[in-house]
Amino acid sequence: MKRINNNLSLFCPRRIGTSLLYIFLGLCYNLSYTKLCEISHKGDPTAMQDNYDSPGFEQAYTYTGSDLGATWTREETRLRLWAPKAVQVRVRLYRSGDPWASDLLEELPMEPDVRGTWRITLPGDRNGVYYTYLVDGREACDPYARTTGVNGRRAMILDLASTNPRGWDTDTDPHGGRPITDAVIYELHLRDLSLSHRSHIRHKGKFLGLTETGTALPDGTPTGLDHIKSLGVTHVQLLPVFDFGSVDESRPDLHQYNWGYDPMNYNVPEGSYSTDPFHGEVRVAEMKQMVKALHGAGLSVVMDVVYNHVYLAEDFCFNRIVPGYFSRPGSNGSACGNDTASERAMVRKYIVDSLCYWAQEYHIDGFRFDLVGLIDTRTIREAMDAVHAAHPNVLFYGEGWSMDTKLTRPDVRLATQGSSGELPGFGFFNDSIRDLLRGSVFYPRVLGYVTGALPDADALRSCFMGVTPWACAPGQSINYVSCHDNHTLFDRLALALPGASREELIRRSRLAAAFCLLSQGVPFFLAGEEMLRSKPRGHGKFDGNSYRSPDSVNALRWGNLEEAEYRQTLQYYRGLIAFRKAHPCLRLQRREEIFAAITPISCANSHTLAFRIRGDGQRLLVIFHADTEDTRFPLPEGRWQLFIDGQRAGTEPLGSFTESLRVSPLSAAVLACPD
């Protein structure tokens, strides 16, 4: 180190590569965080980068209070905003939530306060008043907005209690207190459920569509909520229902479709799913009605959350208030244009506060994290601890893929599958079981077990037993063969086997479903998989990325259930779910229990996998047979009752067998015998 003068020291220069020379300077006083700083050498100035990641900034400006945003009472509303680099902050009050309306009521200065926050108290009852912040000339919505007007540009002050449906105080998670391995998760896009005219749902594409009961086809086959309830699943995972930016809420006539992975306001329900996006209280009230209706049907509600990136980083409200703070500089591991800097203290607080808010205010029972491998483990741990302090049964799981992201500091661990040991109780999607069963998700001609490839028997056995190498407990493995991403199960099979008959594809799809729904861990499947969901594009092609495809591609085709092959597949899924729920030995919680209860059986046919399971006072024999020829399977001693074969599944026996069982081609078989 060389001291240049009383205020400045020069540390050893460091050369990076062949052309860049980094020089590290140390100051004996703090720089202003609200002013642009430059270093000049011989008259050539260089602007200093933001200092968000310096220990001094975090120490000076980490705010830990619980009052960010608007705090309403009939007597007054208090606003608090975190804007540590701002020189001037003002609040604008509006009559409406329409960003095109010229209806400014007043503009008031806010006062700087502790830890980089600004505050103001508005006297009187301001319920229903809309507002924005003006931060050094940049207008922005409140990041902590509880609701907004149309298209999420103006926040709204709201008496949240006034939006509660009748009986909200006693509304609870119908599966609270049950282990995660008891869950059967059904992934649903809100719009897909109701858009078909055959759904007979009145509120098409709306929160309220998922509250309607008594909807059915002419033959009485239930649709909508009644269909989901009759299926036997325990949890409905909704694709993003927070406010996203890729749909113009003011133009419902355009029939716009999007999955919703374009976050705009994290704590606000999506306006296009409400019957009136112009009045902020409506979306809040209707989403609560939907949650209550699902709970009333015995279904827990999981919310798909997307904290890893935002719709447009430069336009995101947090970044307009604190420029660049919310996003990792120059990083695009999400492939959506930006990555969230979750490792920064106030971003972490924002994510934790948001999750606690949804669990408390909307009674959300679980959170599925999109690309959670871009979020740091500390943030996930703190979020789980904070939510579980008040709501101990809320589920946490997500996509733990390893992504290429540019962290703002080197000591950060990301929440990937490989970090499962640091995140007990957090589940990860098991892409191994997906690809082993159906084949590569990216290369349709790379086959899997149910599409005809010789199996990786050891890997498949590990998946069935819930002991995938990265999972510390079976509850950390979310088992699936289809989700909203990529092709549906049926389309993936059709692409892999273009010469296969429809009957063969159906048998293969049921085999895949049986493997997932009978494996240890947490079964998960895409809405419509139970009725052979397909997304055809014509000319033998299928839509493998329908995030903004029209309703004609994405809507569930309820009318198909009038045909036998669809009804039979639906009944098969119902039977598999019922059988799983009736047998605790299929839902074990610890590895030690699994190794004590389950024994893989050596099979002569390389396309056959079999397991013996002891528990609940009986023995189960589970057989998977992916060959196109039948096989004769020898049975252990005893009289065995068959509950599942390639065509039927349930809790009522289909027949009794001793000595051996003929297993049909491309099918599963499950038998039980008293122990």
Language model feature labels by segment:
Residues Y22-I23, Y29-E38, D44:
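Short, positively charged and aromatic/hydrophobic N-terminal segments
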Residues M48-E76, L104, P112-E212:
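The feature marks proteins involved in alpha-glucan
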Residues A83, N127-V129, L654-D675:
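C-terminal beta-strand-rich structural cap/linker in extracellular carbohydrate-active enzymes
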Residues W100, L105-P112, L254-H255, G260-Y261, ...:
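Active-site-proximal helices and loops of the catalytic beta/alpha 8
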Residues R191-Y362, V372, T379-H391, L395:
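Substrate-binding/active-site clefts of carbohydrate-active enzymes
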Residues P474-W640:
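Loop/helix patches that line or flank the sugar-binding groove of alpha-linked glycan CAZymes
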